[in-house]
């Protein structure tokens, strides 16, 4: 399942076989474009998520605290923290909300004529989907294109258990989990419940701030 770069093509009713196609990062975003070699999938050994860094995302509906696991996703956590520390996520909106799937953000702001893509400022990163962390409810993971090593700034939070997104998933690559919600899961549930049109919130849910916390 890949998350497509085209923002409005996600179907409103999702079967398990099509849901993966919605996790692609929307927009240009500066991802890698090299053709990957075909992987030989082997299911990673599950690991316990360990919190090494903490981030608070303040949204227009409340705060979401994240515990990030640099022990198992060092590249992904370092990348996410760069965007947080740069203030990149301020005024970003949740551009995709699918109640029983994910809430996704990290690539769009609200302009006068609709959503405006915010170009990623760092190169795409290596995919760490084989780290043994699972796409369970409340975990945060990176969105990407169909190219495995293409994640930049866009992320999603799982609103339900989405183990079909784990490596190898249907595309052979999976999606990299790098943390979990430690406080504010009720805010995630508020976001997942907002009214949407073509999986885009009718009223913006905006990230007001994102910062590292003790």
Regions found by a protein language model. Name each.
Residues 2-5, 9-11, 26-214:
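Cyclophilin-like peptidyl-prolyl cis-trans isomerases
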Residues 11-18:
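Sec-dependent signal peptide hydrophobic core
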């Amino acid at each position: 399942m890949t998350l497509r770069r085209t923002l409005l093509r996600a179907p409103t009713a999702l079967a398990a076989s099509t849901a993966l196609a919605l996790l692609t990062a929307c927009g240009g975003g500066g991802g890698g474009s090299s053709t990957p070699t075909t992987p030989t999938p082997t299911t990673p050994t599950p690991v316990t998520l360990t919190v090494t860094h903490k981030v608070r995302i303040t949204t227009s509906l409340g705060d979401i605290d994240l515990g990030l696991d640099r022990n198992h996703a060092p590249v992904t956590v370092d990348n996410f923290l760069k965007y947080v520390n740069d203030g990149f996520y301020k005024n970003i909106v949740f551009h995709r909300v699918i109640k029983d799937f994910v809430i996704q953000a990290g690539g769009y702001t609200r302009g006068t004529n609709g959503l405006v893509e915010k170009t990623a400022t760092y190169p795409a990163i290596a995919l760490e989907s084989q780290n043994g962390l699972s796409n369970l409810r409340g975990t945060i993971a990176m969105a990407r294109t169909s190219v495995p090593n293409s994640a930049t700034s866009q992320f999603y939070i799982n609103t339900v258990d989405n183990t079909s997104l784990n490596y190898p998933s249907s595309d052979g690559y999976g999606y990299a989990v790098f943390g979990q919600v430690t406080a504010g899961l009720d805010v995630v549930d508020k976001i997942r419940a907002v009214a949407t049109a073509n999986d885009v919130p009718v009223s913006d849910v905006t990230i007001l701030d994102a910062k590292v916390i003790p």
